[in-house]
């Protein structure tokens, strides 16, 4: 008798995705981050439900409702900090997942890659709106500054900002709609994840060598179902260590002060995972130019398949490209640091140089060095 997992309409889908899925035999721990992102999304949705039961999206009570969750709700503090620090874990896994895609040339699967970029934008939008909800000082001023960037759009900018705000400033209407969007976006993210996986399973996974591995495939279960839980264990251990020992390590002290439109914080900045893009935005003196650079800092990923000039897919056997890749990583860390610094000398010039290096590396140096490596293959 044929196994039910191979015949039942629903079980068949799960079987082809998680059990009998042909996977390359040589994929490393860098391929774990997809499932870790799934785990992060699950943690975020579950903790979000518990928080949404007690949170009120009103400017008068939002801050005190978050305080109430931490003080009066049974284990509310751990749920709140699991959600806040879970977002940080989510972005760490996202950045490593994207970095792995760049290093090993996974962007050549253009449909999967482009859906991934949409996912990145959706998760960033979700995280930004979530940061506004506690209605602390940084929530309010972060929302004001970031939404105000849309006013740089010619002709419709000012009307667009007021339409998003629901008035002439960030107020109750803004908070209510941000809560609604923050609630619905993770489900859109989950739907996009399904499309992402659908396109991935059309082509099969890439592997560290970048060479087609159809001749050497192994079933996902048991070989990789036994490897994935190790990543889960490490991620949850790291998250719980952060939550139980230093829950406010990655937050901003200003967000423990209730929002006050009459008092501007000395230094407005977003969460740490947006600082690299924020530094690029600030490095350009022109408002519209800054906004375009901000969008391009993420949208540049869509150009990766077009900028791939190498005859080899992966960077595994390309030492010059490897060097440039790690310079890019160092540059992004530098931008993250600069984004958290005040706008003064020497941080302004460092930010401008780091922003220039970021775009110059991706648009110019990496494609040229790939062509040089092609020539070296003939030696």
Swiss-Prot record:
Membrane topology, from the record: Multi-pass membrane protein
Q: Which sites bind a ubiquinone?
A: 201
Q: What molecular function terms (GO) are annotated for this protein?
A: metal ion binding; ubiquinol-cytochrome-c reductase activity
Q: How is the cofactor bound?
A: Binds 2 heme b groups non-covalently.
- Provide an example Pfam family for this protein: Cytochrom_B_C
Q: Which GO biological-process labels does this protein carry?
A: mitochondrial electron transport, ubiquinol to cytochrome c
Q: What domain of life does the native source organism fall in?
A: Eukaryota
Q: Which InterPro entries match?
A: Cyt_b/b6_C, Cyt_b/b6_C_sf, Cyt_b/b6_N, Cytb/b6-like_sf, Cytochrome_b, Cytochrome_b_C_euk/bac, Cytochrome_b_N_euk/bac, Di-haem_cyt_TM
Residues that bind heme b b562: 83, 182
What does UniProt give as GO cellular component?
Answer: mitochondrial inner membrane; respiratory chain complex III
Annotated transmembrane regions:
33-53, 77-98, 113-133, 178-198, 226-246, 288-308, 320-340, 347-367
Q: Print the keywords alphabetically.
A: Electron transport, Heme, Iron, Membrane, Metal-binding, Mitochondrion, Mitochondrion inner membrane, Respiratory chain, Transmembrane, Transmembrane helix, Transport, Ubiquinone
Alphabetized SUPFAM superfamilies for the sequence? a domain/subunit of cytochrome bc1 complex (Ubiquinol-cytochrome c reductase) (SSF81648), Transmembrane di-heme cytochromes (SSF81342)
Say which family it is in. Answer: Belongs to the cytochrome b family.
Subunit annotation? The cytochrome bc1 complex contains 11 subunits: 3 respiratory subunits (MT-CYB, CYC1 and UQCRFS1), 2 core proteins (UQCRC1 and UQCRC2) and 6 low-molecular weight proteins (UQCRH/QCR6, UQCRB/QCR7, UQCRQ/QCR8, UQCR10/QCR9, UQCR11/QCR10 and a cleavage product of UQCRFS1). This cytochrome bc1 complex then forms a dimer.
Tell me, in a sentence or two, what this protein's role is: Component of the ubiquinol-cytochrome c reductase complex (complex III or cytochrome b-c1 complex) that is part of the mitochondrial respiratory chain. The b-c1 complex mediates electron transfer from ubiquinol to cytochrome c. Contributes to the generation of a proton gradient across the mitochondrial membrane that is then used for ATP synthesis.
Q: Protein name, please? A: Cytochrome b
Q: Which gene encodes it?
A: MT-CYB
């Amino acid at each position: 008798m044929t196994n039910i997992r191979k015949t039942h309409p629903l079980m068949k889908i799960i079987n082809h995705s998680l059990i009998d899925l042909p996977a390359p035999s040589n994929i490393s721990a860098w391929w774990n981050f997809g499932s870790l992102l799934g785990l992060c999304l699950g943690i975020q949705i579950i903790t979000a439900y518990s928080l949404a039961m007690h949170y009120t999206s009103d400017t008068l009570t939002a801050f005190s409702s978050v305080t109430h969750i931490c003080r009066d709700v049974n284990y509310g503090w751990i749920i709140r900090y699991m959600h806040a620090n879970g977002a940080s874990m989510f972005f760490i896994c996202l950045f490593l997942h994207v970095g792995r895609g760049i290093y090993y040339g996974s962007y050549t699967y253009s449909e999967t890659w482009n859906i991934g970029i949409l996912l990145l934008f959706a998760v960033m939008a979700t995280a930004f709106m979530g940061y506004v909800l506690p209605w602390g000082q940084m929530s309010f001023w972060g929302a004001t500054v970031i939404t105000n960037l849309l006013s740089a759009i010619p002709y419709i900018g000012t009307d667009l900002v007021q339409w998003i705000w629901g008035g002439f400033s960030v107020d109750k209407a803004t908070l209510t709609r941000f809560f609604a969007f923050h609630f619905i976006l993770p489900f859109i993210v989950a739907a996009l994840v399904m499309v992402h996986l659908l396109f991935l399973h059309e082509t099969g996974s890439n592997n560290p060598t970048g060479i087609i591995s159809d001749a050497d495939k192994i079933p996902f279960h048991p070989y990789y179902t036994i490897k994935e839980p190790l990543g889960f264990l490490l991620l949850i251990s790291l998250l719980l260590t952060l939550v139980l020992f230093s829950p406010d390590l990655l937050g901003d002290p200003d967000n423990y002060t209730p929002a006050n439109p009459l008092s501007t914080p000395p230094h407005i900045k977003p969460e740490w995972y947006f600082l690299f893009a924020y530094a690029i935005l600030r490095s350009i003196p022109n408002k519209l130019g800054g906004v375009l650079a901000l969008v391009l800092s993420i949208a540049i990923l869509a150009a990766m398949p077009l900028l791939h000039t190498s005859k080899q897919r992966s960077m595994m056997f390309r030492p010059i490209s490897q060097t440039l890749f790690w310079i890019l990583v160092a540059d992004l860390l530098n931008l993250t640091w600069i984004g958290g610094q005040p706008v003064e000398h020497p941080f302004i010039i460092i930010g401008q140089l780091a922003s220039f290096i970021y775009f110059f590396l991706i648009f110019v140096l990496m494609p040229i060095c790939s062509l040089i490596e092609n020539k070296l293959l003939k030696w």
